[in-house]
Amino acid sequence: MALTPTREDKFSFGLWTIGYTGADPFGGPTRSDLDVVEGVERISELGAYGLTFHDDDLFAFGSTDAERQTQIDRLKGALSDTGIVVPMVTTNLFSAPVFKDGGFTSNDRAVRRFAIRKVLRNIDLAAELGAQTFVMWGGREGAEYDSAKDVRGALERYREAVNLLGDYVTDKGYDIRFAIEPKPNEPRGDILLPTLGHALAFIETLERPELVGVNPEVGHEQMAGLNFTAGIMQALYQGKLFHIDLNGQRGIKYDQDLVFGHGDLQNAFSLVDLLENGGVGGGRSYDGPRHFDYKPSRTEDITGVWDSAAANMRMYLLLKERAQAFRADPEVQEALAAAKVQEIYTPTLNEGESYDDILADRSSYEDFDAPSYFDAKGFGFVRLNQLALEHLMGARS
């Protein structure tokens, strides 16, 4: 398998990722700002297919209409010259002081109205550029103090805003869907819709739930101690994986935004196997962008920025290669069969069977030999996982 990225791999990068200057809460930038044209040209040379951005990444908050249009035109020119596309756009409702208490859920009604206007304008830009996904990360939607935010009221305002956006894209005829990006905390002490499960539940309350899915990020779910692959499987199962953010995270701590695979490598392996092949038991795989939302380390110069961008794509392709070998190994197939992984797809009830039938079936309870599972009938899960790790480590081909 070739390890050189191509457009067919659908690798994309956020402008805020390759453009990260190294500033953090404890120190200023260590690199200069990145011009958008240079960013587009360099990721094109590396083999990526897409660039994503927040509005404030492309033109500064408070820019005049002329300044805004100048940057949009420069981006369009670079896209035309390189063939790079914009698959996703999002809006920054977290950096400017006006959003100190959030955008859609700020306690200040005027701020909420301003936030909606800012988003509507950027949806128009997304449609103009051909983006089909609009991500919503509510980084400031939350609180540090329980008494400071009425969560029930905040969720209702969140719902009101998302419903309005759904009306807008429908009435405009835009081919755009929304993807909510969960995160448990940071920058707020607690963020609304903190995990993938919270977001999926919230989506079901909306007036147009078919227009709204999720954009889970590796590090965000792992900050909450969750298994990212398992969460992605549920999002796929519910038809809600509209976009995905790939990066690396090493445990429950601050959002590290490492290169993909440079954190929990085993979970990254199972994730790529799922995205490419549908999981060990089959099921739906993912055909959308493989989007890298990482930060080049503060220690790096501009050469290190592009090395880290390339590393994301190479890590994904290496893991894809390892997943293909894992699937093709006859011993793995034997271990999967011994572990009865596929049997989960056999309905527990027979066709047409009701609770009356299962209550009448003595073999399911009265005559079932439960003691036979003591000292016997192991599932072989450890052997299966050992085979997976040996493939991950390149010990098996």
Curated annotation (Swiss-Prot):
| Protein's GO biological process | D-xylose metabolic process
* Coiled-coil positions: none
Q: Does the keyword Chaperone apply?
A: no
Q: How is the cofactor bound?
A: Binds 2 magnesium ions per subunit.
GO MF entries: magnesium ion binding; xylose isomerase activity
Chief localization: cytoplasm
Cell location: Cytoplasm
The answer to whether UniProt assigns keyword Cell cycle to this entry is no
State the needed cofactors, names only.
Answer: Mg(2+)
What reaction is this protein's catalytic activity?
Answer: alpha-D-xylose = alpha-D-xylulofuranose
SUPFAM superfamilies per the record?
Xylose isomerase-like (SSF51658)
* GO terms under cellular component: cytoplasm
Matching NCBIfam families: xylA_Arthro
Family (UniProt):
Belongs to the xylose isomerase family.
Q: How does it assemble?
A: Homotetramer.
State the protein's name.
Xylose isomerase
